[in-house]
From Swiss-Prot:
Source organism, top-level taxon: Bacteria
Record InterPro entries: DUF16, T_SNARE_dom
Family indicated by similarity: Belongs to the UPF0134 family.
Pfam families documented for this protein: DUF16
Gene3D superfamilies hit by this protein: 6.10.250.40
Protein name: UPF0134 protein MPN_504
Length: 126
């Protein structure tokens, strides 16, 4: 994998070797240099700059379309999940209301039993 070297490292390499040395196939790099980096770079454990890659408008449109399709699928899944969560929320709310009614009924029954108990106590004490 090719990585960019800093301008400082490049200038240090030029000073050490005394010349700019390239050979082999011509490749264009992001910093405008051309050539395959050779012995000097390996000697000083430097890595050549990353090659610049260009894409055509058609390739970009294909990439954009595929991304849009992927995003649409994700949006649809999210919409379905939101609907499911809303349904569950409504069910939980309904269950909560039912529990409230049950608790109120139990409270009323408890109050009635307390009143009956007081009456029984009064009758027994007579």
């Amino acid at each position: 994998m090719k990585e960019k070297i800093s301008e400082k490292e490049y200038k240090a390499l030029i000073r050490k070797t005394g010349k700019e040395h390239f050979d082999g196939e011509k490749e264009e790099y992001g910093d405008g240099t051309v050539g395959v980096w050779t012995y000097e770079l390996r000697k000083y454990k430097l890595k050549p700059p990353v090659k610049v890659k260009y894409v055509t408008q058609e390739q970009f449109q294909e990439y954009k379309d595929s991304n849009n399709q992927r995003l649409i699928k994700i949006e649809n899944k999210v919409d379905k999940l939101v609907e499911i969560v809303q349904i569950h929320g409504e069910q939980i709310k309904a269950q909560g209301e039912t529990l409230q009614l049950i608790l109120q009924t139990l409270q009323k029954m408890s109050d009635r039993l307390d009143k009956m108990e007081k009456r029984i106590d009064k009758l027994e004490s007579k």
